[in-house]
Amino acid sequence: MVGEGPYLISDLDRRGHRRSFAERYDPSLKTMIPVRPRARLAPNPVDDAGLLSFATFSWLTPVMIRSYKHTLTVDTLPPLSPYDSSDINAKRFQILWEEEIKRVGPEKASLGRVVWKFQRTRVLMDVVANILCIVMAALGPTVLIHQILQHITSISSGHIGIGICLCLALFTTEFTKVLFWALAWAINYRTAIRLKVALSTLIFENLLSFKTLTHISAGEVLNILSSDSYSLFEAALFCPLPATIPILMVVCAVYAFFILGSTALVGISVYLIFIPIQMFMAKLNSTFRRSAISVTDKRVQTMNEFLTCIKLIKMYAWEESFINTIHDIRKREKKLLEKAGYVQSGNSALAPIVSTIAIVSTFTCHIFLKRKLTAPVAFSVIAMFNVMKFSIAILPFSVKAVAEASVSLRRMKKILIAKSPPSYITQPEDPDTILLLANATLTWEQEINRKSDPPKAQIQKRHVFKKQRPELYSEQSRSDQGVASPEWQSGSPKSVLHNISFVVRKGKVLGICGNVGSGKSSLISALLGQMQLQKGVVAVNGPLAYVSQQAWIFHGNVRENILFGEKYNHQRYQHTVHVCGLQKDLNSLPYGDLTEIGERGVNLSGGQRQRISLARAVYANRQLYLLDDPLSAVDAHVGKHVFEECIKKTLKGKTVVLVTHQLQFLESCDEVILLEDGEICEKGTHKELMEERGRYAKLIHNLRGLQFKDPEHIYNVAMVETLKESPAQRDEDAVLASGDEKDEGKEPETEEFVDTNAPAHQLIQTESPQEGIVTWKTYHTYIKASGGYLVSFLVLCLFFLMMGSSAFSTWWLGIWLDRGSQVVCASQNNKTACNVDQTLQDTKHHMYQLVYIASMVSVLMFGIIKGFTFTNTTLMASSSLHNRVFNKIVRSPMSFFDTTPTGRLMNRFSKDMDELDVRLPFHAENFLQQFFMVVFILVIMAAVFPVVLVVLAGLAVIFLILLRIFHRGVQELKQVENISRSPWFSHITSSIQGLGVIHAYDKKDDCISKFKTLNDENSSHLLYFNCALRWFALRMDILMNIVTFVVALLVTLSFSSISASSKGLSLSYIIQLSGLLQVCVRTGTETQAKFTSAELLREYILTCVPEHTHPFKVGTCPKDWPSRGEITFKDYRMRYRDNTPLVLDGLNLNIQSGQTVGIVGRTGSGKSSLGMALFRLVEPASGTIIIDEVDICTVGLEDLRTKLTMIPQDPVLFVGTVRYNLDPLGSHTDEMLWHVLERTFMRDTIMKLPEKLQAEVTENGENFSVGERQLLCMARALLRNSKIILLDEATASMDSKTDTLVQSTIKEAFKSCTVLTIAHRLNTVLNCDLVLVMENGKVIEFDKPEVLAEKPDSAFAMLLAAEVGL
């Protein structure tokens, strides 16, 4: 209601003058009009609402009715109000935050103080509404109930008019109370949503301001933007409520003292004593929650790593290791959650416990002092204490909100005070100079704000937000710095690039080469401004485009990935597609360039991802191009086409910096730089450097394969065949080679071309509104997970006994008053008069007192037992569901991970687990307490005043209609909110992956804009969901006000046969029921909504189909299998899913034991699919693979995969130590580890690290270069001692020299093994025994490389010719 308009983001106008009150609060003042005269066309109906519509949530009624009649979707709901939008509120919050920092500095700045300033006007208005509500709430039970009871016990029945007036007054106060209460929540919800969107947007903007991230982990960011932002939402809702407690306590204390005397102070004291106890419990809860959140971050981070590295984990059969790791972390998390749960459960139970203790102690003390007590006084005090119970009842909500918000604000402040370093990039003075580095010495940024990390964690974690699945994460621009390991592991940052000096003029092509870890990618990072300049100058002129070493692909279609926010120009776009060799790929995709690319490009091959990344750069039409090894993932034909058509022709006149390991391309560069150990070793033209016969010339000789068996003869033959073919023919072949099938190692959709304007069935499955609908099966699953029906029944019994004891105490007091009071009613002159003896009888044996005190003790005892039992049960359920879902997902086939976005899975394991761990128990506990209290109230009222049930039955029809509409609407809105959260999650993770690319193309604003759109969409659905709860609550309250009025009339007008104590009990209970019934229904609905998370997890338990494990057949497999390593494919066919084309079609081949086979073919020919088949990541459509006379389908998956070894195309390292990455199972000695490190030329690098084998490996292994990561993966493979080795482009990220050394190592280390090598660089397969050439999933050639090279029409000879011709 109250707040700034969408364009008034501060109190000052552009000239610095303070805005007038009317200007700042114009929208809010319009809302103050009781009834707006006519409907307007605001995007959100709340902006057209008058005060009555706003306070009663009537503006939401059309949405509720629509939800009952039709299924709601994201598109059918109105958008978020502009006044509540991310953009406006983030700007306003930022102004206040900057003022705070300017005033006290970043370290002393209080984010909590800024939050208060941001919402104080609205909070004050909320408090005013709450105070008015509390005054009305206290007035009814204290004054009016007392007057009504006094009236019926001491006044003759002839004065009916007074009784009716008192009843009308009671109805008025109760109705006004619920109206002010609804108004307070209406204000609160919009306040909370504004705070949520403001801070989440500001956090995201701040994270995106960094070019590299060093101060936060991936697990933290997911938790902060999901759980923490929601914690602030709840804090904004509940924190203002305690402000009314002092007023309520004073009013009730004064009146209690007035009607009861000094003994009323006993009950008041009980409340006052318990309030600091709750505050202490809040502090304790905050401590436990803070500890639990840090463990949750670790679990989410490890889960993220698992999901993004799932392919390698499956190939290495490490599922059990990861399951144990996750389960161990979960156990630690559960222990901390248990402690927090005990405290929280105690807080929740305090309301009924404190109320009972206060009432019992007050009356017991009163009676022992032999003070007089009548029914009007007793039940007025009870009604008043029940009103005071509100102060204790709301405190658990407020305490929990404050505890969690304090933790969240601390985490958020850490992000907000972190500032990106100033840019060191300057502008060259000469306009013809595009790049200028003069004596530039650079280092990686020192990590900050990670106090929790051990000293060894001072390693430079340069952009820890990227996904841990290396083949899918975005930028490897900072990777080549492993050679500087001892320097950047030290306490202060040391240089990685030393005294770099060179100049690149406009239109020139600079080639950069060097060994693994020499600093090539670091140099690109330096040009992007991602490092720290220690000395010298780095000058860059003009806008640039950047192609990272491993392509960043975001979720969207191909065209969106290429355009990257630029306007579509058909001619320019088609040309870009052609020169990047994508035309045939797009034609074969089911929807052309409108085909949806799965998250991280899951349905594309590595070469396709890289060419789309290159196409994005070409289409951007920039002056400077930084290309970090863009052609390593494509074969020779495609590489030649792209280099000739794209880099040499299309980019002619542009300035290009090309980092490459494919040294044949350097001949065409205007200048070449050779890096070694972060320094320029040689610099000049290709010709000059060759004439110098230095290190560069040696690298070129390595390229020519002088170490291979007679490769010169093979090359010479290929060259002869090349000369026979015209250049035009070769170019045409190169274009045709630009993409046969779409997907290599991933699933193709279909070969049939479909209308690109109507994509109907894309790869990534979207969540439907029906997913997550809560049914009885959901509760059944949850109950079974919690320990079974017996355990759940015992927990319910404890709730029953606790609330029953509380209700019994009040009922027993009524009995006591009934028996002990001498009330004589007689008819005199047609009037009924009652005289009361105001002293209680039968106190000498103290039976009534003892039973009364026993009821208090039982409430306390059952409350404590219930708290421990309920917390253990709910956490057992959430942990059981977590483990079951994780175990199901772990064993799902790769197709599941290809079609399910990681953002959606992370949503399940972060936000949904937070719901099950914390929020569901909290709501469920309150609901069960309220439910049993409602039941006991109805039972007692039926016993003492049965006519009340007739009144309730009369309004039951209206109640059921409301409930039906409400239940359906809330369920629909919760589904929509869940669905809209997943794209928001995916965008966050995708943006952090592509941080370097986003900055290079200057698309930060576009990325933030999309975040705001998705954030607003999800927040609007969250707001609608919560408003729907209040929509129902208000209408239920009004119904119960009518019931209260009717009961009050019946009490006033009823016959004298019903005792005064029964009437008093009925009135006090009906007042309590008036608010309690709607709270119970609403809390129950909220609890059911929280069960949506359980249902979403249950769906994975039911729908995740495990891989076909096929256990051993008895006697079919020897213990030492495979002993030889012979592989036979028999008529083998494979497709990724039903109704999709075959990716391997009728393979028949035999590979003898100990042979080395090079597998080559164009992009998408099925090379990587061969590896998927061998490891049974995909089951065959028909045919068999036989290894040493054993059909692999008869072997258990774990047994099969542990016997084979895969060295992946993209290196995968996990967070941990070097030792853990080499030997996760801990089954090898240190000596064995050093031996394999020496054989892979990594021993010296690891020896330089302070911790050596125990040195930390950061997320994605980013403290090692890509090449070094690959060498570590090679060392890992050597340890496994397998008879069959598959190398999938394993040396693509290595320079030719290291490649040569590694190839010789492979030949020596695996000489008794069968080795299959998938490669694009043909020099890596020339020394193989056999070469397997694939095309369209079929074997087209299979022979010795020299034999195939001598055949002029062989496909292998054409591939060689293309490479040699470069």
Swiss-Prot record:
PANTHER family membership: ATP-BINDING CASSETTE SUB-FAMILY C, ATP-BINDING CASSETTE SUB-FAMILY C MEMBER 12
Tissue specificity of this protein: Widely expressed at low level. Highly expressed in testis by Sertoli cells and Leydig cells. Detected in testicular germ cells and sperm (at protein level).
Domain of life where this protein originates: Eukaryota
Protein name: ATP-binding cassette sub-family C member 12
Gene: Abcc12
Membrane-topology annotation of the record: Multi-pass membrane protein
TM stretches of this protein: 125-145, 152-172, 235-255, 257-277, 349-369, 377-397, 788-808, 850-870, 931-951, 1038-1058
GO molecular function: ABC-type transporter activity; ATP binding; ATP hydrolysis activity
CC annotations in GO: endoplasmic reticulum; endoplasmic reticulum membrane; mitochondrion; plasma membrane
Known function: Probable transporter, its substrate specificity is unknown.
Record keywords: ATP-binding, Endoplasmic reticulum, Glycoprotein, Membrane, Nucleotide-binding, Repeat, Transmembrane, Transmembrane helix, Transport
Compartments reported by the entry: Endoplasmic reticulum membrane
Residues annotated as binding ATP 1: 514-521
Domain ABC transporter, chain residue ranges per copy: 459-702, 1127-1361
Annotated Gene3D superfamilies: ABC transporter type 1, transmembrane domain, P-loop containing nucleotide triphosphate hydrolases
SMART domains for the chain: AAA
Region (Disordered): 470-492, 726-749
Pfam families to which the protein is assigned, alphabetical: ABC_membrane, ABC_tran
Skewed-composition ranges (Polar residues): 474-492
Domain ABC transmembrane type-1: 123-404, 792-1089
Species per Swiss-Prot/TrEMBL record: Mus musculus (Mouse)
InterPro entries recorded: AAA+_ATPase (IPR003593), ABC1_TM_dom (IPR011527), ABC1_TM_sf (IPR036640), ABC_transporter-like_ATP-bd (IPR003439), ABC_transporter-like_CS (IPR017871), ABC_transporter_C-like (IPR050173), P-loop_NTPase (IPR027417)
